[in-house]
Structures are given as C-alpha cells and as structure tokens.
Amino acid sequence: MTDPTAPAAPDVEQVRRDARAALDAVAAATRALDDAALAGPSALPGWSRSHVLAHVTAIGEAMARQAERAAHGELVEVYDGGAAGREAGIQAGARRSVAEHVGALESLGERLDAAWPGPGSSAWDAPVTYRDGTVVDALVAWWREVRIHAVDLDAGLGLDTWPRALGLHLLDFLGVRLADDVAVELVGEPTALRVGPGGLRLAAEPGVSPRTETPVGSDPGFDARDGVVVRGRLTDVAAWLAGRRPDAEPDAFRDGVRTPLPGIGPWPSPYSPPR
C-alpha cells in the first residue's frame, strides 16, 4: 500500500551522479592535504581524517560488492568478516599516505561505475544483503555515506554541498531516531513537510503529524500540544538527525515554549530492513 503523504523517492540516476560527484570532491580535497592534515582530527570524535577516508573507501567497496554479487544472483555480507572485518579494514586503511588514499578513492570510483546497473535496468531491483534491500538501496546507502563523510573530513566540504534531495532522504531515513512524542517541522520549504518516527511526510495541518495516513493503523498521529516540535531548515535538521553539527541549530518547543533539543536514538542498523 502506497502512503499518499510520502514524498517521491530520489531519482536513481540523480543519486548515482551525485554520489560520483561527492566521491570526486573527496578525492580532490584529499589531494590538497599534507601528512600533518591527514593525521589531524576529523569532525568525528576519535577519528583522524585518514580514518574517515579509510571508512569512505571501505563502505564504497562494500556497496560495490553488494551490487557485483547481486548481478550474479548472490547475497554476501556487507563487510567481509562482519563488524570485526569492518573495524580491522578501517584501522588498516588509516595507515595510508595521502597518495595511497587518492589512489584508493580513484580505484573505488572506477569500481563503482562498473558495478552499478545501467539506466532503467531491472538489475537495480536485484536483492542484496544490506537491509534486506535491493541494489537501489545499496546505491542510496553509498550516496548517504559519501556525502555525510565528505563533511566529516573537515577539509573544506561543508553542509552547503548537500543537495536538497539528500536532505529530504536523510530526514526520511533517520526519522526512526525520533521518539514517538517528537516531530519536526521544516521551515523555508515550498511544501509543508513533517518528520517523525515514520519518516518524512507531507504535512496535514499545523501541529498535527500526518502519520495517521501511514499503513500502520495503530499509529495515533502526533499532536504538538502533547510532545516536542523541532523546527529548522532542511539541511540543519538533517545534520542534527545525522548526529552532525548544523550551521544553525534547530529550535525545539513543547506546548509553544522553547525547550532543549530532544535526544535521538541510534543510527538505523545495516541489518534492519527498509520501511
């Protein structure tokens, strides 16, 4: 059953092109680093810029592998060796030099270009292990990761590099991080949009979430008088929900009175099926 309040999914070819543009931007930013900057702190606590680059390469290779094996009707783990393999790969990759990182990113771009199906191909619907989804889900995950971590690199790529389509996708994907008594109202958008645990939806009326329109009939909807409403611009709210520092912190209100921003839940698991 299609939810009439859910905005359209991002266009696959648009996502593929923008993910490639983001990877190229990361590679260009990496070329400008010296050894000290590479070893310096990123925007992610405990990770150097080299760790971020290692992760970008690792997640890109993981999603390329999902697509490559799906083309042969095979399902494989997201990371070879699971979570332990992921961590070991990041730590090993963090020892690369600037030139080695650039080479790895360039090779990754070529691999991804070859791995993704052609425009309109039915291969986009092939199943993958990632979130029990399809090759489209693997592509969107890569797009999400490379755009977010491009900013985490803290090397000149800011939130202004996030296209509007990414911001909308992040709100839909990360809405599950919100508690049931929290909803988000976006300001400055041509269409009234709201975000709640059910994801991104077209707003029904001020103060009421349209989650009653979702297929889950037990969802009672959200009344702003009973919970917290977070208001902010698209990119700022998306950054906050992604656990990143927004350019302008969103505002939170309970019963019309300003209140601290609510806590958010964990990042959706790569093993959780898509909604």
Q: Where are the model-predicted features located?
A:
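Active-site-proximal cofactor/substrate-binding loop regions of enzyme domains
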Residues: 14-18, 28, 36-65
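Structural signal for well-ordered, non-membrane alpha-helices
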Residues: 23-27, 31, 60-64, 106-117, ...
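Structured surface interface patches that mediate subunit assembly and partner/cofactor docking
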Residues: 2-14, 68-78, 118-275
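Short, helix-capping/interhelical loops that line the mouth of catalytic, cofactor-
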Residues: 1-14, 62-111
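Generic structural signal for individual residues within well-ordered alpha-helical segments
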Residues: 50-53, 102, 238
